[in-house]
Amino acid sequence: MDLQKFTQQVQQTIADAQNLAIASEHQEIDVAHVFKVLLTESDFAKRVYDVAEVDIDALQKTVEDALTKIPVVSGSGVNYGQAMSQALFQLMRDAEKEQKQLDDDFVSTEHLILAVMDQKSNPITMNLKKQHKSKKQIQEAILKIRGGKKVTSQNAEENYEALTKYGRDLVAEVRSGKLDPVIGRDAEIRNVIRILSRKTKNNPVLIGEPGVGKTAIVEGLAQRIVRKDVPEGLKDKTIISLDIGSLIAGAKYRGEFEERLKAVLQEVKQSDGQILLFIDEIHTIVGAGKTDGAMDAGNMLKPMLARGELHCIGATTLDEYRQYIEKDAALERRFQKVLVPEPTVEDTVSILRGLKERFEIHHGVNIHDNALVAAASLSNRYITDRFLPDKAIDLVDEACATIRVEIDSMPSELDEVTRKVMQLEIEEAALKEEKDPASERRLEILQRELADYKEEANQMKSKWESEKNEISKIREVREQIDHLRHELEEAENNYDLNKAAELRHGKIPAVEKELLELEAENREKTAQEDRILQEEVTENEIAEIVGRWTGIPVTKLVEGEREKLLKLADELHQKVIGQDDAVQLVSDAVLRARAGIKDPKRPIGSFIFLGPTGVGKTELAKALAFNMFDSEDHMIRIDMSEYMEKHSVSRLVGAPPGYVGYEEGGQLTEAVRRNPYSIVLLDEIEKAHPDVFNILLQVLDDGRITDSQGRLIDFKNTVIIMTSNIGSNLLLERTEEGEISPELESDVMQILQSEFKPEFLNRVDDIILFKPLTLADIKGIVEKLVEELQIRLADQEITITISDNAKAFIAEEAYDPVYGARPLKRYIVRHVETPLAREIVSGKIMPHSSVEIDLADKEFTFKVTE
């Protein structure tokens, strides 16, 4: 017996049968061992018996019984599974005869299945006879599966019914109602139909950005085929979606992948144009299965594509088409391009309306129309790195899932009460152990409290469960309507007019009426009482998801946020002292943006802050970040002195291709891409190379910039603040009593215009002049710095108070109009914080003590009280 004459699957089956015999301590490998392996591991054997309508469970039980009857041999020196039984040897001989009769090159699994039918006394054959299955019936099933193919390779079993194994029948999925409806895209579907109707090169390739609905167009074509809404040439055709992944997966030996693909193509060819092959991500066939000297899938397709023997629909993205298919001109010319543009917001809304019912049935929720409109418009405005309708569909899906999870999980109010009950029960158990009168009194009070909480918990639980049941009932009725509509479609397609009439005029209206009654009852209950569960998906839920994805607040303003925004200017005044105009302009820009009336095509605001050092330019940006986001982490600070050389400018948007750091992206663009709602602070802009401002022109005007990777970065939700010391000499010399005269402002602007190009300055919203700080401002800043010191010492539980004399002395001593507030910090560190630190370290100031700082003979005194 030559093992090379057997297919790989038969060889593997015998090896596994031997392992089974060894594990079972059987001396010989028997037919039962082989069939145990075939029925558990061979998909082909199961498929044969399935087509022959054999009860596989009964057959498996027979095999199990036969195995238990084989004697177990134990003892030393016994070799298990080293010999074949007489019956198995005969089975192999008979299998070889079957192979010759069927004119095959190798002995494969089907020959074993046929050969066992010749062993009349074998329990397997007896069981099949009992099921009234003859050898002829089994042979017919095998020939049906083989589809006229011969066993010409050692991988033969892999290649039977290749389309079923490596593809999905989209038309069958439409018939069984598994695919979502396809709305719109009529022009593209008509274009595909036109190309498919050609004599040669009838192979459309759908090209478009990820998420625009390329696969949906093919699904739409499948739905039209089912509805017979296609030209005569396409009626009754089948669309098979080929899964390249499963075609490649498990191809261990050279040539195995090509063999599988050849089997697929052969089946398509044999269908005489009845099968349209859809290859999603068609660029994967270029180079697929290629090893040294081997032919790749793309080259195998070319001859059939050119001759029109293969109707193929491809789908790929623009980038991948350019990268893979355009390089192979011979493959490209065999396809006809169909460009799939991104749908408009209006088209997306109609797509969402078409899918609304499917989402409602799946999630068991109620979707408002304003939620669909919000999903399309908000995703278009805020999620800029993805494409419609995919991103809008994802938004609706996630919003529905959020509501569904809330329905299924315990409401927070009930959860709180349940936890309180548990806590009181633990306390009750502890108090029962105590025997003193006080504990007994406390136990009585606690038991009354516990009874109240338990009653409340039970009421809430029953209310929650009844609401949940109502929602589930509505969901079930919706599913029933969907199922009946699918049945109606099937009946109409099969011209079963009696069934169609019964469904259309009888069953469907009755169930729809039931649904309307349930929904009306539900609405009535909602109006009368407070509901625990929410089943409505509104625009607020969509806005919350957008905020969660992007970090941009797009939900409607809640009361607390309104107050926060209206008080933004006051909050900033407390942190940035003496710069009222600057604070007002910046807070107004944020107010306009949050109210939703800013220009949607530009950043929230762009400002140039001009003024001497230490007057609060950077401090205002920090204060704004803290007030808007409760942390300074949302401030993207870029020191423009790092961009003084021409070659360093590219670091903002990323190194060009071929340079080190190309993959990392730009310092500015990457920061904004990850955090689209932030404050961008460009510090000391006059120190940057002039080319930097050419990059910023697009950002300031259109709120967008393209990075080195070709990605569009959205700056529409950023506040751009640029600081500069230009004109600070004039501001210091000519500011009178803390006011800037119009002449001074004009002179500073002239200096600014000589430094920067007019097209740059013209795009900035406001140029704000910061006044040099007066002595009164400095006193206010002293108060602020002392408060900060008090907060730092509060951690050590030390309180400090500074007398007014000491504060006034600090302000006068540290005041320097040229350097602003920075010397003030240094002065407090040197003359207040350092002596204070020395006292703390020496142990003179202990925790829980208070320190009074006063002035005596121009020296600070520290009086400690416990």
Curated annotation (Swiss-Prot):
SMART domains: AAA, ClpB_D2-small
Region (NBD2): 561-772
Residues that bind ATP 1: 208-215
Coiled coil regions in record: 393-527
Domain Clp R: 3-148
Region (Linker): 343-551
InterPro entries for this protein: AAA+_ATPase (IPR003593), ATPase_AAA_core (IPR003959), Chaperonin_ClpB (IPR017730), Clp_ATPase_C (IPR019489), Clp_N_dom_sf (IPR036628), Clp_R_dom (IPR004176), ClpA/B (IPR001270), ClpA/B_CS1 (IPR018368)
Assembly description: Homohexamer. The oligomerization is ATP-dependent.
PANTHER family: ATP-DEPENDENT CLP PROTEASE, HEAT SHOCK PROTEIN 104
Family from the record: Belongs to the ClpA/ClpB family.
Functional description taken from the UniProt entry: Part of a stress-induced multi-chaperone system, it is involved in the recovery of the cell from heat-induced damage, in cooperation with DnaK, DnaJ and GrpE. Acts before DnaK, in the processing of protein aggregates. Protein binding stimulates the ATPase activity; ATP hydrolysis unfolds the denatured protein aggregates, which probably helps expose new hydrophobic binding sites on the surface of ClpB-bound aggregates, contributing to the solubilization and refolding of denatured protein aggregates by DnaK.
Name the record gives this protein: Chaperone protein ClpB
Gene name tied to this protein: clpB
